[in-house]
Amino acid sequence: MLNKILLGLNKNLTKIIKTFIFFWLLLCVYRLIFIWGMSEYLSADSGHNLILTAIYSGAKLSLQTAGGLTLCMLIGFIAETIWHRLKYFRYICSFVILFITTLLFVARFPFYQQFHSGFNQMLFTAMHEDLYALFISLVEEFQLPLKLLLVIVLVAILNYAFNKFLAYSFKVKRWQILPEKIKTVSLLMCVYVLGTLSLYGGGWSWKSGVNWENAGITNDTFLNESILDDYQAIYRAYANQMRMEACNGLSFSAQNVRDLAKSLTNKDGGNDLSVYLAKEATGAKIEKPKHIFVIVSESYANWPLLDKYSNLHIADNMKKIIAEDDTIYTSHMLPSGSSTVGALMTMVTGMANSNLYLTTMPEALANPYITATAPQMKNLGYETSFWYAGPATWENIQEFTLAQGFDNFYSRGNIDPNATGSVWGADDEYLYDAIFKQIDDNKMTFSVILNTSNHSPFNIDLEKEGFDASKVIEGLPDKEKNNQELIKELGHFWYADKMASDFINKVKAKYPDSLFIFVGDHADRYNIDKVPTMYERYSVPLIITGKGIQKDLLPEDMAGSQIDIMPTVIDLIAPEGFTYYSVGKSLSENKLGQSYAFWITADAIGNTDDLVEKPQYFNREVLPDRTVLENYINGVRAISWWLGKYGTIIDEALLQ
C-alpha cells in the first residue's frame, strides 16, 4: 500500500519537475528569439559578452516565472490524481497557460516597436481608452486575426509536445532500480532546489537572486528590457501602477495652496506657482566651478561624525575634509524621506516629499518640473549627468532622470563589468573610478551621484579594503563588542566614508576648480544606542567643499532639508539677476528644515505632527514660532503636491 502511494507521489513530483523545466526552457527560447528578431534595437557597442550577460540574467529571472506557471498547473495535476479522466482538464490547463505565454510573446514585438519597452504602465493607460477603437486598431494595424491564428497553431503544437514530454518515461537503469522511498526523497530535494531558485529568482536568497527591480544590469536599454520575460514585465507594470495609485499625495484645496504659497514666499502670485517659486540670484559668492559633484550617499547618517562617536573611527576620512579651510559642514539637515527614493525624487525635481511616487507618475515622465535640478544647471552652462551604481531599472530611475532633464544617465552597465558589488549595485570604488575617468575638462559638468555600498547585504571584503575592525571594537560599548553584524555594518559605513573622501581628494588634485556637495540620502538604519535621540537617528550631514568655499560663507545657524541644497548651490555660483525656481531656499537665509515626519533648526528637532509640543534639544533650548513652523511645513508640502500632480496653475477645477 505504501509503495503504491509513493509510486503515485513520485509520478506527480516528476510531472512537476518536468513542467518547471519545460516552461523555463520555453521562456528562455522566447527570449533568444526576441533578442535575435529585434537585434536592430541593440546599441552599437553591445557585444557578445553583454548579450550573454542579459541572457544569463534573464534565465535566472525566468526561474521565478516558471515556478509560478508550474503552480498554476498543479490544479490540473491534482484533478488528474483524483480521477484519471480529468487528464483532459490538465490538457486544457496547459493549453491556456501556453496560449497566454505565446500570445504575450507575439504581442511583445509590436509593443516594443511602439513604446521601446517591454510591457509597462501603458497597459493600464489602455484601459481608459476607447476599447472598441483600440480593438479595431489591433485588427487593422497589427493583423490581429492572422496572428491569433498563428498563436493557436503554435500553441497546439507546443501543448502536444508538452504532454508528450510529461508522458515520456526516461529509461535510466540506475534510477529504476532504486527503492521508491529513495526516489521520493530525491525528487522532493529536487523540487525544493527548484522551488528555492524560483522563489529568489535564480539565487539561494534575495541577496543573490534577480528580480524585476534589479534586472537592468547592462548599459543597453533593449537588453535590459529583454531580461524581463513578459510575465515579469507585466508584474513590473502592475507594481508601479499600484505604487502610483497608493500615493495620491496629500489633500489641499486650491485656496489652501494659494494661501500657503503666499505665506511661504511673501508674494502674491495669484494662481501661478511659477510666480511664487521664482527667485533671483544676488550674485556669485564663489568663482564659478568647472565641475560640480553632488554625492547622495547611501545611509550616510550624521551621528558617526559627532564627537561622541569619534572613538569608532568610521568617519575619520570625511572628518578630515570637514576640517579643511575650504569646507562647510552642517548637521542641521534632514532627508526628504525615509528611503533612497525620497532623496532621489527631491534631488532630481527640487520638490519636498508629498506622498507622490514621482518616479512612475506620467506627469513626471512627460516634462521637467520648473523646479527640476538639471534644466536649471543647464541654464548655467553645465552638461548634466546622473550616475547610479545600481541597475538602470531600479525605481524607473533612468526614464525618470532623463525625463526630468538630465543630459546623460549612467548606471551599473557603464561601470567596470568585473566590479565587485551586491544585488543593489557596484561597490563605491568602481562607481567613483568610472566617474573620474569620464570627467571632461573641456566642458562645464554637473553630476549627481547615487551610491549603494552602505546597504545590506553588506558583502564587501572589508579586510581587503583595509578596515581595522579592532579600532571599532575598542570604541564599542562592552555589550556590543561581540556583535559581528553591527561591526560589519559599521565597517561598510567606514568604506563609504573612505571611498567618498578618496574620490573628492583625487578630483581636487587633478581638477582643483571643482565643487562637491555631499549629503546622506537618509539615516535611521543602524545606531549604537538602542534608543537614539531624534537628532542622532534622523539627521544627515551636508558637506560643501571646493575652490572658493570658506567656513563663514554660510551662517552657523543654518538649517534645512534636501529641498534647500540646489538653491544653495545656485545661490553660490549664479550671476546677479539669474532667475531660478525652487521650493526650498538657500541656506544663506534658511533656518528651518522639514522632512516626511520631522522638522529641525540649529537648536532642536521635533515631530511634524506635534510641532513644538515635544521637541528634543541638541543645542540651545530655543524653539521656532509654532505658527511659522506649521505654515512652513504645510507650505512646502502643499506646493510640492500641487506642482507634482497638477503643474503650475492653481485651479480648483483640476481637483474635479
Describe every region a protein language model picked out:
Residues L2-C247:
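Transmembrane and membrane-interface helices of multi-pass
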Residues L26, H128-Y132, L228-Y231, A254-R258, ...:
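Alpha-helix initiation and N-capping motif
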Residues A79-F89, H116-A126, D130-V139, I157-F165, ...:
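Short amphipathic alpha-helical patches
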Residues F89, A246-N256, T360-L365, V583-K585:
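Short alpha-helical "patches" and their helix-cap loops
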Residues A126-E129, D229, M244, F252, ...:
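Short coil/turn linker and secondary-structure boundary residues
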Residues D220, I227-A278, E324:
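The feature marks either
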Residues T265-Q656:
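Solvent-exposed soluble domains appended to multi-pass membrane proteins
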